[in-house]
């Protein structure tokens, strides 16, 4: 693999990414569990417990499965409109990209003081076919994911939780389906994929129309 813009090979950048994820986990005292343990405890995670999905490299902590909790339903095959609010945080310092560990890169959650950011959630159409999940953003407003990252493709890492959550329609910030994720570059945004860096997310999932 040829060297990237910063003079490192892709393999070296992947090693740096893995080191950054490991350091983030240690600094936040996360407990990492296997998929087997996750299934053995009925796809529930404890407060500071993250399950590692080996195939994707995504780490997930479920904060709330949805407004009806375990009595809700996972999404069935077909198309669904999903509304998400999120915060995207750098897990790795990258001088050439002008961000450091812990920097907020993009968000539309919480009191930001920017009405354009706060007013609209991310809207995307989720398609489930057998075990395949794909999604496309439906809007490209200023400061939206599609606008900032130049693609309507929803990061694959965002879709991993939807196999386990039971989202509904709610205006309650306490009952909305919500997760925390650590997403490696291959499951992240187009920019993360291009420059090989991981991100931490907190994301909510609400059903649209």
Model-derived regions, located:
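Cross-family detector of peptidyl-prolyl cis-trans isomerase
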Residues: 3-209
């Amino acid at each position: 693999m040829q060297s990237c813009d910063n003079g490192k090979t892709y393999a070296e950048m992947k090693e740096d990414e893995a080191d950054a994820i490991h350091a983030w986990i240690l600094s936040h005292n996360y407990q990492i569990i296997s998929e087997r343990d996750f299934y053995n405890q009925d796809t529930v995670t404890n407060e500071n417990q993250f399950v590692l999905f080996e195939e994707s490299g995504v780490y997930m902590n479920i904060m709330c499965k949805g407004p009806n909790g375990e009595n809700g339903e996972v999404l069935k095959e077909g198309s669904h409109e999903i509304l998400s609010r999120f915060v995207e945080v750098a897990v790795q310092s990258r001088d050439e990209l002008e961000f450091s560990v812990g920097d907020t890169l993009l968000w539309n959650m919480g009191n930001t003081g920017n009405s354009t950011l706060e007013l609209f959630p991310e809207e995307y159409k989720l398609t489930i076919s057998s075990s395949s999940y794909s999604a496309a953003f439906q809007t490209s407003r200023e400061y939206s994911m599609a606008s900032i990252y130049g693609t309507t493709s929803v990061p694959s890492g965002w879709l991993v939780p939807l196999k386990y959550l039971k989202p509904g329609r709610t205006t309650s910030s306490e009952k909305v389906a919500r997760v925390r994720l650590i997403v490696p570059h291959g499951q992240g945004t187009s920019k993360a994929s291009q420059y090989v860096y991981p991100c931490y997310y907190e994301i909510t999932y609400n059903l649209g129309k």
